[in-house]
Amino acid sequence: MAEKSSAAASAERYREAGVAPVNEQPGFISLIDQLRQTFGSGARHPLLDFGHFANVLDIGYQEAIAISTDGVGTKAIVAQMLDKYDTVGIDCVAMNANDVICVGAEPFAMVDYIAVEAADDHLLSEIGKGLVEGARRANIVIPGGEISQIPQIIRSERKGFGFDLVGTCIGTVDKDRLITGDKMEAGDVIVGLASSGIHSNGFTLARTALLETAHLRLNESAGELDCTLGDELLKPTRIYVREIMQMIREGLPIKALVHITSDGFLNLARVSQGIGFVMEWLPEPPPIFSLIQEAGGVSDGEMFVVYNMGVGFCVVTSPEAADRVQAMAQNAGNQAWRLGHCIEDADKKVELKPKRLMGQDGRFTPY
């Protein structure tokens, strides 16, 4: 039988888990159209449209302000189940700072919003530890935030410990050095930087597959994991700020910077203008991904839509600079690989040759 398109399969699985995709729903489109009405001209107008990892605001000076917001999603549920909250703050910083650097901006501050079921001292203190560690890794400050106690809205696996954690990060970038992907050309090289694991995406599917379908236990190891399942799932999202900023400061010809989150390598198309991407080599994904795939009966196509599959960030650069990009990432303590190259393609397709998958319009289809 022919395999279902991974986009359709992914949507079905998320609906089964209680999450419906919104990016093509009329309400989402209407919201975006309304927010565009706030865009003006002159000082303070956005330099990019919706859909990039971060937007950039012209404030009337040569330096512009990059801004992005994101949260940890249902990774918070795993933290609640384990009563372990000291790493989700790192995830919150990572999800925001990694987006801000995608436009070539250097992040310098983030504010947080913590919505809680109850203002538990231990919960808040442990979240704070993670935020501080994340700020250290990203070289930013956290000058403020908000705590909202809303038990009527926030519920949890452990009564009294429900929370949601969101951040908004800002950075600065010279308008002449803005990185948007518009300078990519055929022959440019795609360098992938290793992820630390599942990062902060796909947790609804992971919990459904691992805990509800396969009945695995968070406090036990499984498969080829070198730690308990819970510790693996809570590994903090890797922060790529220092190595990316070094590449920019040293003047490497960086054509595009891509945070690999939900939608996987399809995120490359977010920064493309008439460029397609051919992945000729892929690293072996960490064991957590095969564990999810086997437990949930998930296709390769769906896995590469939902998860980073071992590559948390991509740098598109000229062929002559690819070795230096790899070396800088490795000097920062991270693995990095040449994954593929760019081609001229008005459809902005992403081909994963080792998996015989073609990506376009939010899906990977086998060929």
Predicted regions and their residues:
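N-terminal amphipathic/basic leader segments beginning at the initiator methionine
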Residues: 2-39
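Residue-level signature of catalytic and energy-coupling elements of molecular machines
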Residues: 20, 70, 187, 259, ...
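Glycine-rich phosphate/pyrophosphate-binding loop regions near the starts of catalytic domains
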Residues: 30-196
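Short secondary-structure boundary/capping elements
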Residues: 48, 88-95, 236-239, 284, ...
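Short, acidic (Asp/Glu-rich) active-site segment that either coordinates a divalent metal cofactor
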Residues: 175-225, 229
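Glycine-/charge-enriched secondary-structure boundary and capping motifs
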Residues: 2-16, 123-141, 154-163, 223-232, ...
